Amino acid sequence: MLSPCLAVPATECRDPADAPAAPARHTGPARPRKRRPRNWKPHLPRERLLERGPAALTDAELIALLLGTGGGGRDVFASARALLARFGDSLRDMLDAEPDVFATHPGIGTARSAVLIAVTEIARRALVEKARERLQIDSPGAVEDYLRLRIGTRPHEVFVTLYLDARHGLIDVEESARGSLTRMAVYPREIVRRALVLNAAALIIAHNHPSGAVQPSAEDRRLTRVLHEALALIDAKLLDHVVVGTADTFSFARAGWL
């Protein structure tokens, strides 16, 4: 008797026992599907900064990038907005804040405070350096703008001396003291000694009034007179004493007091 396998292709005439076993079903826990990351680029400040530049970010978003994470139960953007609001939404006021202000703000802490202090100091030095490069001593307006930028928003009184050569070129700028002129250790003899070391032919002195009022006090006028007379002994000239406020200045020279 002929085998039925002779009438059909061999592949169709296999013994069922020889057929390959069906793949076993996976009976364990389902494998989690990999989620494709969402495209957050239109939303996250870091990505927008890299793609569109820092001008695309708000002040609060720039601060949020510095903070990195939130604190005090807030997300990082709420922390950034709260910090900025503390300075009246003014980056300029934030730039001139005392270092301990950041550390005492809720949710900031020591590490974030250090970052903010470093960044604000870098920004302030860059602005002062840029203004100094463009400073024209023969232009009273430029000198006053420079001084306003340097000390106008300081929360304490700062005494600054500009040492000039015979052509009124800038030799050096020094902050001599801090506090208030009634308690600040401003010693005319030290300024005169420094002028001799630098071979300065002329000086401009300045200090700020944190109150914003620029009307000179009696102590301001007395110090100006003493320093003017002391510099005359070494053939150096006091060109001006500028009192600096947050938005205005007072010039002794312009007022005819020198």
Swiss-Prot record:
GO terms for biological process: proteolysis. Zn(2+) binds at residues 207, 209, 220. Residues 13-42 are annotated as: Disordered. Keywords: Hydrolase, Metal-binding, Metalloprotease, Protease, Zinc. InterPro entries: MPN (IPR037518), RadC_JAB (IPR025657), UPF0758 (IPR001405), UPF0758_CS (IPR020891), UPF0758_N (IPR046778). Residues 136-258 form the MPN domain. A motif (JAMM motif) lies at residues 207-220. It comes from the Bacteria. NCBIfam families: PRK00024.1, radc. This is UPF0758 protein BamMC406_2419. It comes from Burkholderia ambifaria (strain MC40-6). The lineage of its organism: Bacteria, Pseudomonadati, Pseudomonadota, Betaproteobacteria, Burkholderiales.
